[in-house]
A protein has these predicted regions:
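Conserved beta-strand -> loop -> alpha-helix junction used to position metal-binding or nucleic-acid-contacting
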Residues: 1-4
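Active-site core segments that coordinate phosphate-bearing ligands/cofactors
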Residues: 6-72, 83-94, 98-99, 120-205
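Flexible, glycine/charged-enriched surface loops at secondary-structure junctions
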Residues: 52, 105-107
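Nucleotide/phosphate-binding loop and acidic/charged catalytic motifs
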Residues: 73-79
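Gly/charged, well-structured mid-domain segments that form the phosphate/adenylate-handling core
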Residues: 109-116
Length: 205
């Protein structure tokens, strides 16, 4: 995955990816995981062609399990965090999938944070799932950073700073990511995100 990232960085496509996804492509970019699986796990290509393989983030897996495999979906906030989404068009970035040779069909549908994600019956009765949101974006929302210019910093293993930048998508300089904070009633709110990987984890008791 590292070599592919370096190869992309040497081309004009690198800047296009940043301007489209809001994120710098790297080994953490989800579509590159699947590319590695395709190249290294025997039989996976055939299983994808048969429709026996699906891909997604942790929220996708949870919804899939909770609904008994009936719903394969993710939210805008989670999709934008993968680095595989055209965040302005609000859809998967087809050109990136084509470039690395990964079928977009294995990725989940993208829905609003307050959308219908099916129902679960694991507790006996039928319980509707009507909310899915990524972790840092949920913290931004929970801490009432609803208006453009409001900021939160979450400190734990690392530290994550998020700034609500309103309804207009724009990339940020200096390696700071631009992500979708949430999509409510068909309207996206964007945020910029800076990460310090080591904060609390610097202390080993």
């Amino acid at each position: 995955m590292g070599k592919m990232c370096e190869d992309i960085k040497a081309t004009p496509f690198f800047e296009e990816i940043l301007n489209t996804t809001g994120k710098v492509i790297g080994p953490h970019t989800n579509v590159l995981f699947l590319k590695w699986y395709l190249d290294n796990i025997p039989g996976i290509k055939e299983k994808i062609e048969k429709g026996d393989v699906l891909f997604g983030t942790i929220d996708t897996w949870l919804v899939w399990k909770l609904t008994g495999g009936k719903v394969h979906a993710t939210s805008f906030s989670n999709a934008s965090s993968t680095g595989c989404m055209d965040v302005e068009k609000q859809e998967w970035y087809q050109k990136l999938f084509d470039y690395v040779g990964v079928p977009v069909s294995v990725f989940p549908s993208i829905q609003s944070e307050s959308s219908d994600y099916g129902e679960t019956t694991i507790f006996g009765g039928s319980i509707p799932i009507r909310g899915v949101i990524a972790d840092q974006q949920s913290a931004l929302f929970a801490e009432a950073c609803i208006d453009a210019g409001t900021v939160k910093c979450t400190n734990g293993t690392g530290s994550v700073l998020n700034i609500n930048v309103g309804s207009k998508f724009q990339t940020s300089p200096g390696g700071v990511d631009t992500i979708i904070a949430w999509n409510l009633d068909g309207k996206c709110t964007y945020a910029v995100e800076g990460l310090v990987p080591v904060t609390g984890s610097a202390l080993q008791w």
